[in-house]
Structures are given as structure tokens and as C-alpha cells.
């Protein structure tokens, strides 16, 4: 009896070619697993394709709800933006995919898990580390990392075996998408001087095709988690879709970024993340009103580490769980509503309110009703500037003494 290998199957070029390659190279029975994390695909056709290209069995698992509640919501509370730009859509889905792959491998009695990651990308690290953490006894096979074929050669290999190839050699974009965003790379995008052609974008409208009138969007949060849009309570999936639809209509969410990959190289990446950029910005605005200065400053350091953890494939680490404990505690009073204005490819926060706001109008106003006691400022300024004053007075003397001795 042949050994079983569970393959993370997307229906794309690399994983379709991998089915045949695993059979040729290892003589293993391939079990294809396709995981729905919000991909806009026909999963029935993908399952049929997996069986057609040689898989012994094919699974489709819908984990969108789990992805939103257990991954995306955590990312929002942590304001997760890698290098301050990328909302980590692809990176955030990888640990969940690894978890489902391990679960099915254990159910099937498989001895190995395979994925279609290349040797240059970050995903190979995310999958390998996740799988090794959850099930270290399982062997990991990465065909695209081993076979040494270029993308064009992989296309030729697939065509040799009659595997449909849905992309062209002339413009071979590699695309990944889920609830939280869409990433596009390869082809002409590998030259960072090239402007992305219109065909790169599938979610967001070009600015010239967006409405002339701006649109207002209100997002309500409860303890750091978005729960309603424009006054309507929504499920996690419906809420993300609602914000996505409004933001993409106005051309919001396009990102063109040269980022530092985990493997040590720089990569030009194009992203579409309309819901992500809007919801994270709204959350940050609410935190600015409900967290103290010291909380915000410390949390910003935590957020940078948290984003790196996601990007670097360490979701299942103890440190991520430890940071979650702090982040969850910080969100106790992050409840309220944020109003945003979207227009012509951009947006900005134009209002916020919270029953737990630390903004005190009576203390901040310069108009009638001012409750701030200006006489308090004199003593504060004296103490606040004492360190600088003493240093200015004492160190020039010390420097003169040093000069006299030399």
C-alpha cells in the first residue's frame, strides 16, 4: 500500500503540477485539500480538477468563520501591519491552513504534507514551521522547492500532462486572495519601476471610475472588535464584506510595496486590502481616544513584534499567545464608533466617539467652559525642565575642567 501525502491544493499551476510530480517522484497517493479562507473561487471545480489531475481524494474545507474570528480579529486588535504597510492577509491565513492540513493528515493516516511554496518565498517558512510545531512527526515535501523548474518550465510540465494552465507565459502573475486581502506578484511586477497595469487589480476600482461624491462609513467596535457598520450589527463575514464593498467602490486599499522577506531578499508586492486598511485605521483612531499615552506607546512596540510574528510564521509560538494576553487586556475599553470619509482612492477618519473616551472637552477647550487650571502649569514646567536645566548648567563646567587637565 502506498503512503499518503496531504497536499495543500489551490487549483493553480504549482499545486496542480505537484500532484503528478509527487506521484512520479515518491509513488505516493495524493490527498488534495483545498481550504476556503475567503477565496473567490469555484471550489466544486477545484475539487474536480484535483481528482482529474490524479489526486486519490479531494477535500474542501470552509474555514472562513474561524479565519475571521480567531485570526483577523486578533490582527485588528493588534493593528497588524507589517512594516507599517502590509495588513498580512496571506501571512495570517497560513497558520490556519497548516492547522487544517495537519488535522486531515492525522485523520487520513498520512505520513507527509506537501505544499506548493517556492524556495524564495515566505510561505514555505510559515507552512513548515507551523506543521513542525503541530505535528513534528509528519514529513514535509515542497515540490516547487525541489524540482528546480522555472515558472515557464512548470507551465510546460503541466501542459505535458494535460493540466490546464490558467495564466500566460507573457504575464505570469502569482495571485493569492482571502477575506482579508489579495496579493499579486511575479511577471512585469518584478521590476519595481514598472507601474502595475490595470489587469493587476481585481477588487478596487481605478480612481477615475470611482464615484464623484464621497461616502461616509461608521464602524462600531466592542472591546477592539468591529461589530457593526453604519448602525447595522453584522456577523464577522458580513461585516468584512460590507466594508470591502464600500471601500473598493471608492478605490481604497491599493498597496504597492517593496518589502523585506523573511528569507533575506526584498520583493515588490502589490496588495488589495480595502476592508483591512479601513478597519485597522478605524481601530487605531478609537484606541487613540480610549488608551492612555503610556498604553499606546507600549502597545506600538508590541504591535511591531506581533506583526513580525505573523509575517515570520510563528503564529503557534508561546510569545504570540503571551502578547495576545496583553493585547486583549488593552482592549477592555476600546469600544465606540469611528466615522470615516472615503473618496477617490483615499480615506480619513473624520469622527470618533466612545463612552470610555479619555478625551475631556472641558480640559482641552480654549473656549468658554475651560476647566483647566493654568496655574498648575508653572510648577509642572519647573519640574519637567529641571533635568535639562541642570544638565545645561553643570556639564559645560565639567567639560571646562576636562579641558584644563589635558
Swiss-Prot record:
EC annotation from Swiss-Prot or TrEMBL: 6.3.4.5
Binding-site residues, L-aspartate: 118, 122-123
Subcellular location: Cytoplasm
CDD domains in the cross-refs: ASS
Residues that bind L-citrulline: 86, 122, 126, 174, 183, 259, 271
GO MF annotation list: argininosuccinate synthase activity; ATP binding
Catalytic activity: L-citrulline + L-aspartate + ATP = 2-(N(omega)-L-arginino)succinate + AMP + diphosphate + H(+)
One GO process term, biological-process aspect: argininosuccinate metabolic process
Keyword Kinase: no
Major place of residence: cytoplasm
Enzyme class, spelled out: ligase
Binding locations of ATP: 8-16, 116
Pathway: Amino-acid biosynthesis; L-arginine biosynthesis; L-arginine from L-ornithine and carbamoyl phosphate: step 2/3
A GO cellular component entry from the record: cytoplasm
UniProt-listed PROSITE patterns: ARGININOSUCCIN_SYN_1, ARGININOSUCCIN_SYN_2
Cysteine pairs bridged by disulfides in the record: none
Keyword set, alphabetical order: Amino-acid biosynthesis, Arginine biosynthesis, ATP-binding, Cytoplasm, Ligase, Nucleotide-binding
Kinase found in the keyword field: no
HAMAP family for the chain: Arg_succ_synth_type1 (MF_00005)
UniProt subunit comment: Homotetramer.
Family: Belongs to the argininosuccinate synthase family. Type 1 subfamily.
The protein, known as: Argininosuccinate synthase
Amino acid at each position: 500500500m502506498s503512503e499518503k501525502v496531504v497536499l495543500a491544493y489551490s487549483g493553480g499551476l504549482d499545486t496542480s503540477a505537484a500532484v503528478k510530480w509527487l506521484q512520479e517522484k515518491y509513488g505516493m497517493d495524493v490527498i488534495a485539500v483545498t481550504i476556503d479562507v475567503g477565496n473567490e473561487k469555484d471550489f466544486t471545480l477545484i475539487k474536480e480538477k484535483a481528482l482529474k489531475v490524479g489526486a486519490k481524494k479531494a477535500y474542501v474545507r470552509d474555514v472562513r468563520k474561524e479565519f475571521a474570528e480567531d485570526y483577523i480579529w486578533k490582527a485588528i486588535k493588534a493593528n497588524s501591519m507589517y512594516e507599517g504597510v502590509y495588513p498580512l492577509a496571506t501571512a495570517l491565513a497560513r497558520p490556519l491552513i497548516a492547522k487544517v492540513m495537519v488535522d486531515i493528515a492525522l485523520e487520513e493516516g498520512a505520513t507527509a504534507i506537501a505544499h506548493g511554496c517556492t524556495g524564495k518565498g515566505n510561505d514555505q517558512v510559515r507552512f513548515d514551521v507551523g506543521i513542525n510545531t503541530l505535528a513534528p512527526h509528519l514529513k514535509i515535501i515542497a515540490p516547487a522547492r525541489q524540482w528546480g523548474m522555472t515558472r515557464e518550465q512548470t507551465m510546460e510540465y503541466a501542459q505535458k500532462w494535460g493540466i490546464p494552465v490558467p495564466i500566460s507565459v507573457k504575464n505570469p502573475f502569482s495571485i493569492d486572495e482571502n477575506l482579508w486581502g489579495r496579493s499579486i506578484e511575479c511577471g512585469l511586477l518584478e521590476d519595481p519601476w514598472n507601474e502595475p497595469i490595470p489587469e493587476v487589480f481585481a477588487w478596487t476600482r481605478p480612481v477615475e471610475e470611482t464615484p464623484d461624491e464621497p461616502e461616509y462609513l461608521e464602524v462600531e467596535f466592542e472591546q477592539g472588535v468591529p461589530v457593526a457598520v453604519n448602525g447595522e450589527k453584522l456577523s464577522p463575514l458580513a461585516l468584512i464584506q460590507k466594508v470591502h464593498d464600500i471601500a473598493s467602490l471608492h478605490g481604497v486599499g491599493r498597496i504597492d510595496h517593496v518589502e523585506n522577506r523573511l528569507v533575506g531578499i526584498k520583493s515588490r508586492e502589490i496588495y488589495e486590502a480595502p476592508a483591512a486598511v479601513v478597519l485597522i485605521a478605524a481601530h487605531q483612531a478609537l484606541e487613540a481616544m480610549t488608551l492612555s499615552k503610556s498604553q499606546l506607546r507600549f502597545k506600538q512596540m508590541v504591535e511591531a513584534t506581533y506583526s513580525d510574528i505573523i509575517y515570520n510564521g510563528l503564529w503557534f509560538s508561546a510569545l504570540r499567545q503571551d502578547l495576545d494576553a496583553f493585547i486583549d487586556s488593552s482592549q477592555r475599553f476600546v469600544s465606540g464608533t469611528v466615522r470615516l470619509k472615503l473618496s477617490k482612492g483615499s480615506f480619513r477618519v473624520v469622527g470618533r466617539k466612545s463612552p470610555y473616551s479619555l478625551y475631556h472637552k472641558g480640559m482641552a477647550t480654549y473656549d468658554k467652559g475651560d476647566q483647566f487650571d493654568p496655574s498648575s502649569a508653572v510648577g509642572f514646567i519647573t519640574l519637567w525642565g529641571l533635568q535639562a536645566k541642570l544638565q545645561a548648567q553643570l556639564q559645560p563646567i565639567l567639560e571646562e575642567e576636562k579641558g584644563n587637565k589635558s
